[in-house]
């Protein structure tokens, strides 16, 4: 019998002195919060009956365990019993199980469903909501969102603090430090070597580099494996805004510092993960690395015995993560990118330590501590990415840390990690196999204010869920009645209930406090006067587990009287759409959301009194997908004092305020969502164009289309998002294409600022080149058709004007022409495209796309895909104007087919559809067109930002590999 069970037994036997002693001991084991109430009760009993010696009192051993005056809920008793923290007899346990089954057997009723239009009929056709991320770690989407919101990083001390954790291995450490000396960067950096209690004296190694590096050395006592504590020691000393972590056996390449800092300066919400290769340095002198900066990258890769961090195939070992990096587009499409966070080569902004905390020092064996730390970064909203340029080289053999150490350590820490990382590593278990995890999978939060009369029914409904991997977080918001006393009396000793109290701040303030207090990954919302059906959490949770891209799952509710009698089923809009949510609060109770999605918003708005939930769920709908379940899982108690039915005038005002704020966050400034009438209870609305929009959008009306017999070329450009760098792009086109007749720009008209309009007009007057603006295709879509659709729309615009063109170039906003006198080059050919083989991944995506697969099978055999050269980036693609019309006719048929069955491709269509259309046309006509490559190039590094020297070098044709595009981000 454990200490807590002994304490309970002693209390129930009236041996309060012994019980107090045992409860005090239990507090040291389980935490004082769990037994604080019992300790108080023991002291009260002893104070009232100081002479009682209960040791001689008889106790019925079969008597039901009673936890002081505040019995635990049934599920909690069973969970404690499963791990021997509460002793129950078999009969007691069976009795509790039967009671729990009765409590949880009720199933939520189906809600009434009717057919509805997903998009309201009065929703403006040109009002397109901002795109959602492709996945939970879509760092590309997040970067665009921050730019739209005007969020810019603030840095005080730009530089990299490099924490190098070590234990013995002086030679290997010296090589790593030598490679840090060889860094090629203008960014400042420091090196903090943190020693986890080495027996060998490492100070001579450090002194060798004192004049070569900004270096510090700190050591902690050898208390076994304490890598987390060693890293934390270094993190607390860091002086720069950015943190880089290296293990002592990870030698960084010469661009390691520069690559990390440059990436974090661009987006300090990233956590950047570096890959590794395996090399053998045991017979190389560290001085050789100091004298030869290129030595590291010239060493051959080796096969290691490290099966935990590498997979061995053939003669070398590979970083097991590389395959996942490729499959997930450098982790952009990963649902759990923190799994690849290995602290031997990573970087992040120091600000995240204030949000997610430091490394967990409970991990005192090899492995797990970095994944758990990465999970917290992910939970609080960091985005994970791997990039080129941050390779580090793992020096083999592993030295004093052998393979057995790693495997044994991982087996120990895996259990700790499962306790503390509920997302991904936790699955739903029956209550017989469950226990109370230190970090629950689900948290239900309850803001509580003056609710003493009904808080018990509310909390009990949360505890009596079919999902038991759950905690309840109650925030007492400065109640003036005895709410806090009731909560503490009923749940103060319950390990699945966490209680906090604060001065009154209103529902938004209490909600923010409670959600911040919660430990779970999935968060459920419950008002203190309401209660849940037993399967509410389970129904929602199963949807989250099926689709990791979901930010929110919600059900519907019924309205009941305080005694539980039915008033009526609540309003239920049967299917979610963002457009409908923009016009009405359709996200009904019960609602669950992910804590990560919540951290991507600014939380509940504490400046408004009503419409707080509407505002919050609009925010959540901007950062992830919603799913609605037509189940009645929530009982909404109407007692006349509900915040949602009080102060209707303020409620209505804020309803329209929060919708307009949502539109503004999405960059939609050309519509206002306005009240239709003055009735407080009415939510009738109308969308009105803003004054800014009403201004004539085309101040470029002075541009007249002028036919020039010497001008032969049309250019179609897709220009996403903002138009920064537009004139720079136009000037580049003119510089290399003297025969340009017309440029048609597919743009988002919301970014046509007065300054940009003036720049376009000035360009037109200077060069007398016709410019057409097109905005037919919505920019706020994440599908892979958009660029192809934009080019198709552009050529349709040209056709409507009956313009006489000879060639057309299809280009991107961020490519750079380097082929002088393009027309002289083009007129030798019918078409310029890039043609290369399809990878296995591309073939799989094509076969998974029915409309395009059907088209291919019409003209080609199944095996043709493996041998056909039909893939190539589309920048700088050109063809005769007549041929473009024929190809786009074929492409339009495919787009129509896609739209008819709502089948969106999972690949960039512009990279293969033009090539396939050309081959199909050749098959249909029997004519083989004269083909060549495109007009622009790109160096192997695929750099996104070039120096002026690099641009001029490219223009001269220097250092450009054949058939490689230059992707030059001239918009930056």
Curated annotation (Swiss-Prot):
Region: A2, residue numbers: 432-604
Effect on the protein upon substituting residue 249 to E/K/N: Complete loss of GlcNAc transferase activity
Needed co-factor(s): Mg(2+); Co(2+)
Protein's membrane topology: Peripheral membrane protein
GO molecular function: hyaluronan synthase activity; N-acetylgalactosaminyl-proteoglycan 3-beta-glucuronosyltransferase activity
Keyword entries, A-Z: Cell membrane, Glycosyltransferase, Membrane, Multifunctional enzyme, Repeat, Transferase
UniProt cross-references to PANTHER family, sorted A to Z: GLYCOSYLTRANSFERASE, GLYCOSYLTRANSFERASE TAGX-RELATED
Family statement: Belongs to the glycosyltransferase 2 family. CS/HAS subfamily.
Protein name: Hyaluronan synthase
Record organism: Pasteurella multocida
The organism's taxonomic lineage, starting at the top: Bacteria, Pseudomonadati, Pseudomonadota, Gammaproteobacteria, Pasteurellales
């Amino acid at each position: 019998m454990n200490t807590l069970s002994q304490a309970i037994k002693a209390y129930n036997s009236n041996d309060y002195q012994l019980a107090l002693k045992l409860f005090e001991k239990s507090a040291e084991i389980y935490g004082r919060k769990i037994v604080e109430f019992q300790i108080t009760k023991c002291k009260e009993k002893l104070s009232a009956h100081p002479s009682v010696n209960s040791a001689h009192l008889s106790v019925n051993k079969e008597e039901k365990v009673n936890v002081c005056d505040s019995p635990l809920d049934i599920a909690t008793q069973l969970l404690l019993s499963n791990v021997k923290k509460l002793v129950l007899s078999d009969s007691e346990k069976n009795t509790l199980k039967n009671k729990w089954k009765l409590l949880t057997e009720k199933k939520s009723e189906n809600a009434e469903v009717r057919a509805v239009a997903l998009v309201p009929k009065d929703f403006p056709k040109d009002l397109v909501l901002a795109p959602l991320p492709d996945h939970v770690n879509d760092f590309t989407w997040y970067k665009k969102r921050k730019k739209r919101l005007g969020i810019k990083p603030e840095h005080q001390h730009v530089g990299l603090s490099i924490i190098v954790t070590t234990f013995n291995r002086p030679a290997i450490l010296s090589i790593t430090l030598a490679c840090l000396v060889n860094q090629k960067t203008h960014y400042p950096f420091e090196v903090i070597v943190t020693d986890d209690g080495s027996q060998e004296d490492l100070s001579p190694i450090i002194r060798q580099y004192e004049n070569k590096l900004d270096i510090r050395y700190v050591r902690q006592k050898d208390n076994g494996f304490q890598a987390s504590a060693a890293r934390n020691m270094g993190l607390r000393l860091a002086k720069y805004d950015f943190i880089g972590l290296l293990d002592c056996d990870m030698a960084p390449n010469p661009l390691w510092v520069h690559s990390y800092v440059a990436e974090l300066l661009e987006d300090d919400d990233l956590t950047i993960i570096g890959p590794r290769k395996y090399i053998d340095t045991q017979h190389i002198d560290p001085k050789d690395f100091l004298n030869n900066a290129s030595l590291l990258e010239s060493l051959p890769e080796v096969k290691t015995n490290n099966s935990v961090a590498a997979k061995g195939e053939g003669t070398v070992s590979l970083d097991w993560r590389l395959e996942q990096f490729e499959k997930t587009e450098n982790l952009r499409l990963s649902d759990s990118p923190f799994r690849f966070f290995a602290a031997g080569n990573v970087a992040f902004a120091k600000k995240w330590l204030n949000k997610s905390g430091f490394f967990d020092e409970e991990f005192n064996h090899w492995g797990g501590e970095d994944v758990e730390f990465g999970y917290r970064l992910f939970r609080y909203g960091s985005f994970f990415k791997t990039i080129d340029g941050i390779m580090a080289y793992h020096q083999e053999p592993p030295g004093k840390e052998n393979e057995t150490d790693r495997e044994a350590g991982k087996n120990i820490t895996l259990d700790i990690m499962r306790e503390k990382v509920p997302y991904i590593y936790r699955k739903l278990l029956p209550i017989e196999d469950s226990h109370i995890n230190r970090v629950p999978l689900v948290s239900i939060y309850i803001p509580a204010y003056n609710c003493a009369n009904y808080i018990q029914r509310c909390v009990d409904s949360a505890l009596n869920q079919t999902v038991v991997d759950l905690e309840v977080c109650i925030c007492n918001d400065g109640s003036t009645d005895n709410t806090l006393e009731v909560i503490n009396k009923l749940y103060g000793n319950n390990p699945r209930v966490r209680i906090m109290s604060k001065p009154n701040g209103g529902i938004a303030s209490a909600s923010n406090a409670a959600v911040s207090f919660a430990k779970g990954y999935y968060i459920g919302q419950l008002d203190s006067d309401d209660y849940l059906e037993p399967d509410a959490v389970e129904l929602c949770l199963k949807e989250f587990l099926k689709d990791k891209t979901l930010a929110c799952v919600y059900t519907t509710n019924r309205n009941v009287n305080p005694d539980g009698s039915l008033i009526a089923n609540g309003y239920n809009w049967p299917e979610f759409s963002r457009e409908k949510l923009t016009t009405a609060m359709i996200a009904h109770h019960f609602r669950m959301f992910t804590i990560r999605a919540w951290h991507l918003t600014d939380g509940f708005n504490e400046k408004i009194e009503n419409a707080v939930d509407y505002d919050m769920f609009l925010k959540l709908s901007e950062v992830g997908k919603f799913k609605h379940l037509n189940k009645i899982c929530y009982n909404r108690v109407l007692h006349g004092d509900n915040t949602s039915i009080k102060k209707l005038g303020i409620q209505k005002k804020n309803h329209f305020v929060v919708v307009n704020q949502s539109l503004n966050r999405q960059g939609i400034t050309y519509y206002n969502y306005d009240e239709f009438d003055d009735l407080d209870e009415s939510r009738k609305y109308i969308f009105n164009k803003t004054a800014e929009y009403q201004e004539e959008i085309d101040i470029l009306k002075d541009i007249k289309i002028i036919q020039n017999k010497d001008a032969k070329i049309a250019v179609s450009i897709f220009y996403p998002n903002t138009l920064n760098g537009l004139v720079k792009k136009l000037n580049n086109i003119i510089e290399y294409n003297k025969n340009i007749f017309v440029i048609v720009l597919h743009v988002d008209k919301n970014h046509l600022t007065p300054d940009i309009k003036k720049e376009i007009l000035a360009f037109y007057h200077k060069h007398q080149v016709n410019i057409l603006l097109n905005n037919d295709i919505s920019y706020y879509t994440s599908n892979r058709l958009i660029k192809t659709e934009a080019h198709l729309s552009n050529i349709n615009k040209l056709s409507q004007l009956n313009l006489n063109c000879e060639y057309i170039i299809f280009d991107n906003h961020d490519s750079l022409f380097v082929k002088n006198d393009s027309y002289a080059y083009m007129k030798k050919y019918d078409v310029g495209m890039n043609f290369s083989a399809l990878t296995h991944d591309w073939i799989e995506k094509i076969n998974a796309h029915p409309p395009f697969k059907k088209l291919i099978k019409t003209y080609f055999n199944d095996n043709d895909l493996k041998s056909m050269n039909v893939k190539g980036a589309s920048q700088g693609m050109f063809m005769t104007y007549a041929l473009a019309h024929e190809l786009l006719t074929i492409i339009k048929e495919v787009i129509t087919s896609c739209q008819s069955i709502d089948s969106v491709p999972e690949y960039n269509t512009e990279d293969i559809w033009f090539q396939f259309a050309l081959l199909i046309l050749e098959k249909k006509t029997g004519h083989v067109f004269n083909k060549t490559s495109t007009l622009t190039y790109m160096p192997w590094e695929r750099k996104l930002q070039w120096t002026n020297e690099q641009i001029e070098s490219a223009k001269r044709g220097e250092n450009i590999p054949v058939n490689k595009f230059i992707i030059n981000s001239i918009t930056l």
